[in-house]
């Protein structure tokens, strides 16, 4: 019996599920001939159905009095009377103005709206119903600006949120709806349109001048603020075309600050394109520029490309770099540094970004700041150095590594003495902005068991321990040669070495050398030296360039690289436009067999007196003369690394024949001097006295298991042969392009034989870095290892600088 009881209950529930008392149904009035008419209003009749014991509401069709629509069928008389009263007051304007209403589906929608939104006026209902003819009814027109509902919104608000442009036109043209009326949240129709999905609605609203376009809601947001917050790029575009103001202050600043806060790049770009001054606007709360609000590298890069001041300060004195470090945003930090942010800028309480980084336990960020010039012993307003901050905040393991690093410059871990305030007074003055720990001396730290021992010497290497104040003698009697290896993005290592030489000598690289030779990336840097570009600038350029050039898979598109070279050196600049120092770039002429080394020069080539190694071929086109050679094409030709980029015409990467151009440069100088003597200009010849060769870092040596290539007799031998062929191919390429080893030995021996000072500077890297490496962390670590190398070879650097500065 219990089973049958549960079955009956289940069937009853299912029946109730499908029996909706408010389901609209088309009926014949003849079916109600025996029913009593309880109420009657216009075309609506409330009938008591005796057979079903229900109260039915029937809408008599104006077109056919014999038929109608049952709007509900209720068992409670009280409920029936309430609903009948509601229907009778709301339905007449609809069936009186449009025959489209007289359909079951439309009536169902309309009656559901009436029940679900009892506070809505007939005009609100008409908007949701979406039948245009209804808006010509006098009663619907009369309620066009009504706010009598739970949200306090007008029918125009609903039309905008719905995105119905046709209904919007009806409301504005026939019903004279006002566009500046606000709802309970202070929002106008423009706010609602922004939250919709139809930009055309916003465009139609903007055709008529209205204060609602720039009205702030209860949260202080204009429609433009709201569009930026929601990332509605097209809405932002339409608002700006409708002359929405960009300079209205919201709770978080101008709309540009809102776009930056929510990382809406497209919206920010729209605003800046309309009003470029917005890029410098300051928010009211922090006095911060849009760059301070950048939360990722993409947003920061977008602003910086458009000329945003990278070192702009907030009301507290902090730069965007301070904020990025505080938020531990390494990608943002790298973008700011590569666009020239001052790594040593003093912000609130005199803190530099390095002070703030010490509390983040992010070694990569600390390395990046130091590599880009942050001083490790700069005290803040409380006299605290980064070392002191590290000793009080950082986690144990990282703290040990950081203190090991900073101890090498004699950083004081005690709370320092501030002029006019004793240590005890300053300690009792109150909590420090960073922490409120005791100012006691931390325990002595042993340097024997600390992690990251290689970090120890870096900071000291950056100190001007061997800076010499003497300047170059312009009438130097000997020539200096600088040779730069190839190596792709590892050219950053060369840049870091040159920065160290410039810092130690106090003289620009261009003024230290008379000859500069470069291959591939070294060729680009040679041209940068020729055109007086600072190495600090080139370091940032390289970090930015890699993301533009190394996109997709190899071989990479040549377009981005060529555009980069044109942008840096000019599209029409010729090699001979700048005469000093003399520069040569290596390239490989690949339109002949065997291939030949070609030098792109900014001077006339010496006349050859030796017999050519091959019989001249009249079918081969001669190289372009220096006076006609475009600088960017020379750089592109020298850097056309096979499998990385397609050849530049007939030129391949110079690294195929001279990845270390030292011997080729010395040969060129000798031939140039001999040519000068033959021409009777021997008085202009200067003896070469110093050769400086800079590498892009030595990869660690690893064992190779097999380079055997043979005809296999079984699957196992086939796999072994394939692996051996791969290793052999890699070895052949490495041998052809090896800038170290015997190439360095030969150059050093030659220099020693003729009495030339030879310096080979090439740091050992901890890992093999590819030519197209794009990871900021990997490249920063390579520069860090370069800084370690600089310190370890500081005596060699000191000797080099002394020789370079001597007459």
Curated annotation (Swiss-Prot):
Q: How is its activity regulated?
A: Activated by ATP. Inhibited by calcium-activated calmodulin. Inhibited by bromoenol lactone (BEL).
The GO biological-process annotations, alphabetized, read as: antibacterial humoral response; cardiolipin acyl-chain remodeling; chemotaxis; maternal process involved in female pregnancy; memory; negative regulation of synaptic transmission, glutamatergic; phosphatidic acid metabolic process; phosphatidylcholine catabolic process
| Positions of the catalytic residues | 520 (nucleophile), 653 (proton acceptor)
UniProt protein name? 85/88 kDa calcium-independent phospholipase A2
Primary localization: cytoplasm
* Entry EC number(s): 3.1.1.4, 3.1.1.5, 3.1.2.2
Where is it made, tissue-wise?
Expressed in pancreatic beta-cells. Expressed in skeletal muscle (at protein level).
Upper lineage is:
Eukaryota, Metazoa, Chordata, Craniata, Vertebrata
Q: Which organism is it from?
A: Rattus norvegicus (Rat)
